[in-house]
Amino acid sequence: MELDVIFSRELHKKLKEKIKGKVFCRVFDDELYIRIDMDDLYFETSYENFVTRVCYGLSTDYVLYEVIEKYERFLINRVRKYYFKG
């Protein structure tokens, strides 16, 4: 198995432990794509230069932490838009 497949599978497993919804992780053209679908919400993020970043120490735990932070901000902004004016 190649490193990108192992990394994306491990990240998927860790994200599923923390997040409700459908989680999709994939490496394509040296870019790690992450998508989370829940109800009618769709969150996407990506990491460019995947191979170089892994060589310099990018770990699934670090990406997990960053994705959770971004996803939390995304959800908070959605709630604000739905419940508050302006």
Predicted regions and their residues:
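Negatively charged, low-complexity tracts enriched in Asp/Glu with abundant Ser/Thr
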Residues: 1-27, 58-69
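Coiled-coil-like amphipathic alpha-helices with heptad-repeat character
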Residues: 13, 30, 48, 73-75
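Intrinsically disordered, low-complexity regulatory segments enriched in Ser/Thr/Pro
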Residues: 35-66
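Mixed-charge, Lys/Arg-enriched low-complexity segments
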Residues: 57-86
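Short edge beta-strands and adjacent turn/loop segments
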Residues: 25-34, 39
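N-terminal cationic leader/targeting segments used for protein routing and processing
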Residues: 14-17, 23, 50, 78, ...
